[in-house]
Amino acid sequence: MKIKLLIALFICVNSYSQSALEIIEKSDAKLRGESSYSEITITIVRPKWQKTMTMKSWSVGTDYSVSLVTSPAKEKGSVFLKRKNEVWNYLPSLERTIKLPPSMMTQSFMGTDLTNDDLVKQSSMVVDYSHKILEEETVEGLKCWKLELLPNEEATVVWGKLIVWIDQSDYMQLKVEFYDEDEELVNLMNGYNFKMFGNKKLPSKIEFIPLEDEGNKTVIEYNSWEFDQKIPSNYFTTQYVSRLK
């Protein structure tokens, strides 16, 4: 009888583990498709001021993306190019493209509450963590899976743990809690204002909140979002970034 119970328990745990990975994979794939093009507004909020910028972004799979700043005038024309684990920055004022060194990867991206490393680790949830379903909860009126993600031993990641809420109907990431190595909650991400982009239902606004900095947050709003568009391969070369429009 004990052997049967152990076998049943093993099958149950293994089944949940597999389902958790599938949920994360489906959610991640939905965010990018084979390729995507988006126009976004980023608002940086601080206790005494706020700043808004707009960008265009193109991506292919998980390895290639390029973002063009379209406003304000001071930053207009700046480009961030991601190729696998490398990030390049084109500065129109200098007419130069520089590769960001490892020492700059943990620095703020354009003054936001995201880092340059966040750009590189876009698919990290799938490949760098083990996955486990904790329970079911309701977020924004939607029934969700609540998942725990723990880093693999060989993974070079910043976070000691992630708690992720993914809705059961459309696989949208509605909420993510980011914990440090001491399992202290550091950052929070919320997705809301759901819209249809083509045949995909997704949060059109994503909010990043650093809990240690009271009153600070970054809000990313997707004004348009198109998937599986044909994007020329030269968009993701250092030679072309100065010509993006």
State what each model feature region is.
Residues I3-N14:
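Sec-dependent N-terminal signal peptides
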Residues V120, K143-T237:
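Gly/Pro-enriched, hydrophobic low-complexity segments
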Residues S57, S78-K82, V164:
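Broad, structure-driven detector of short, well-ordered beta-strand segments within folded domains
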Residues Q18-S35, T41, Q50-K51, V79, ...:
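Flexible, processing/modification-adjacent segments and terminal tails
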Residues I40-K74:
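N-terminal, post-signal-peptide region of Sec/Tat-exported proteins
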Residues S27, M55-S59, N190-M196:
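Extended lipid/amphipathic-ligand handling interfaces
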Residues G61-T62, K84-N85, G198:
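Residue-level signal for tight coil/turn positions that link beta-strands
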Residues S38, S65-V69, V87-L91, T97-K99, ...:
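Short hydrophobic/aromatic-rich beta-strand segments that constitute the beta-sheet cores
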